[in-house]
Amino acid sequence: MQNEIKKVCVIGSGVMGSGIAALIANSSHKVVLLDIIAKDSDDPNKIVKTAKENLHKQKPPPLSFPDKVNFITIGNLEHDLELIRDCDLVIEVIVEKLEIKHQLYNKIIPYLKEDAIIASNTSTLPLKRLKENLPDNIKSRFVITHFFNPPRYMELLELIIDSMVKFEVIERVSGFLTKTLGKTIVKCNDTPGFIANRVGCFLLELVARKAISQKLDFVALDKIFTICLGLPSTGIFGLYDLIGHDVMKLISSSLLAALPANDAYHKIYVNTPVLDKMIEKKLIGRKGEGGFYRLSVSNGKKIKEVININDLSYSSVQKVDISFNNLDELLVSDSVYGKIFTEIITEFYVYLASLVPSVTDNIYDIDAAMKLGYSWKYGPFELLTIAAKDGWNSVIKNADLMHIPLPQYLGNKEYQKIDKQKFNSHKDILQESQIVLENDSAKLINYRENFIFVITTKMNCLNHNVFYLLQEAASKAEKDGKNLYIYPQGNNFSAGADLKLLLSYIEDGNFHDLENLLKLGQQTMLHLKYSGVHIISCAKGVALGGGCELLLYSSYIVANQELNAGLVELGVGLIPGWGGVTEMFVRSKGDKTKLIRNVRNIIEQNKTSSADYFKSDYDVESMHVNMNKHYILDEALKLNLSKKIVPIPHKITLPKINLATEIDTSKYNDLQNKVLSKFQNIIDKHPDTNEEELLGYEREIFLELAKDPKTIEKLKAIVK
């Protein structure tokens, strides 16, 4: 693509800046990371060098694979400005002080390519202020790209532009942020706090200050907001602690300074001395000595405690029972918490109404910002379709929402998000397709003359009917000379076997049918492996157990970077039974080092934290890693694969090796040692073998483990 962004410079190597640099490196793009000179060291790059080194230490890890750090070149703002010259995008991530930002812009402008885009990661300063006194040719390619922390894991990105920004600049930067970095963009008007923090912090401050003034139970309120409104398990007060009371004060102070006096944020931000007192005593949340909650240790056990706002003492969190189980019940409840919730939610929607269209004219962007930036299950406007219409009547009336085109959505269970990202959603694909084959667990569809296999079970779990239809689909694809694409519904590729089905066989002592299920799965995997056409798996989310085996037997994988995949069956007392053990032995190719690694994958339940790790740890050769999970099918369909060279079954020679001496088993439990012994037995007694024999040994071990009472206990614990 012409003018494609190939190299990026990030200025500012703090947690956010280095995190953005790591994200870019994860996409295998070159990135320059610059910062000021260290005044207390002979090494001018000490600050940025330390930041780069810390990328290997942070939790959760910013890098998808250790080697990705090699895409990052470091330097300082005195000696290394020349490194900017060939960068297509420069992202500024420095202190939130306008004067310092302006000084930086003036310093780097002489080094910019004539079509380089400048972006600020500010979360508080207006775009119009950032652009003050800049040349027009810079203003036309200057935007705000507000990443959320941590950049690798938070999908939301707020993009702020104005009328001066050229259309081609918007297209270039948007394409890079979505397709290359995997972000979902919400376009915001140039208003204080943009969308997510303006809405999210308003609700946090509203609830916290009202709860303190009315002496409400924090634990009860958190439970209400989690169960009834779909907030994450942190609730309101846990999230306040997670962000940090000191940070919340900075954000709110910044917003209040920028917002007009008639904005409702001023009204709800009532003086609450106890919050200031908590900050004084370093009770600022998780990074301090406590917050609204804290964790203490008693007799080696962690205990969650909640603060007593009167004297700032703590007591253990007690279980609270609320009298409603969903939003419908809450909105019509006459209880104290029902009334206070209605009061809060009305005030919240009054504020939301005031933001349309000044902050955004698209209510779907508000929903996306809260779901992706604050991890809400539903966006606030989407919630209007979740609860019964009658429950919202008073809220809508009091909040004056009628000037927003909402009534058509009330009670509409088919609430449809307006999709501006130009990718094909699962729903779109199904709507545009014709069903070729179908049963109660899967379907084969024809999508734009391509065969797509879709599993329709919960979490895409595997069972008989999935395997039957998959074999039929592969045969159909082979007959028609078309590749077969396995594409997941929902957010995950496959959670593996249907454990309820396995448990029912084991509890009934029906090991004959269990073995037949193992054989069916193994036959299906071999069918895929030796098919005359490519079997291309589009993997995202989790691919565990049988889901991982399905990937290993595909001829090509297009995987989202955040894929979590692995052979984890030992966690329920079993081993991979649909060819996973066999394929790990086959992929060792007689090499001792590979065999040790592959055996450990199974015994240590190696669930990889990224597609890069899966490719390395599981010896996957034919894989394309993609940063945006929404584009995996699009990218798979664009693959220009040569005709498949069908592998030929061959003799497998296992190396002479003593696994117990080559692997550190000091932390292994009895089950792990037992399985290791079983694998050693195969190596010792069957050094020259083949796939069919290995599959037989695999079934034999699986069935023996299935008869262990401890396996039943583990399965029951998970299936509950």
UniProtKB/Swiss-Prot annotation:
UniProt GO MF annotations: 3-hydroxyacyl-CoA dehydrogenase activity; delta(3)-delta(2)-enoyl-CoA isomerase activity; enoyl-CoA hydratase activity; NAD+ binding
Catalytic activity, reaction form: a (3S)-3-hydroxyacyl-CoA + NAD(+) = a 3-oxoacyl-CoA + NADH + H(+); a (3S)-3-hydroxyacyl-CoA = a (2E)-enoyl-CoA + H2O; a 4-saturated-(3S)-3-hydroxyacyl-CoA = a (3E)-enoyl-CoA + H2O; a (3Z)-enoyl-CoA = a 4-saturated (2E)-enoyl-CoA
GO biological process, alphabetically ordered: catabolic process; fatty acid metabolic process
Top-level lineage group: Bacteria
Region of interest called Enoyl-CoA hydratase/isomerase, as start-end residue ranges on this chain: 453-720
UniProt region (3-hydroxyacyl-CoA dehydrogenase), positions on chain: 1-384
Keywords from the named record: Fatty acid metabolism, Isomerase, Lipid metabolism, Lyase, Multifunctional enzyme, NAD, Oxidoreductase
Xref: InterPro entries: 3-OHacyl-CoA_DH_NAD-bd, 3HC_DH_C, 6-PGluconate_DH-like_C_sf, ClpP/crotonase-like_dom_sf, ECH_dom, NAD(P)-bd_dom_sf
Pfam families: 3HCDH, 3HCDH_N, ECH_2
Spans through the membrane: none
EC number: 1.1.1.35, 4.2.1.17, 5.3.3.8
PANTHER family listed in its UniProt record: 3-HYDROXYACYL-COA DEHYDROGENASE FAMILY PROTEIN, 3-HYDROXYACYL-COA DEHYDROGENASE-RELATED
Family, as annotated: In the N-terminal section; belongs to the 3-hydroxyacyl-CoA dehydrogenase family.
Protein known as: Putative fatty acid oxidation complex trifunctional enzyme
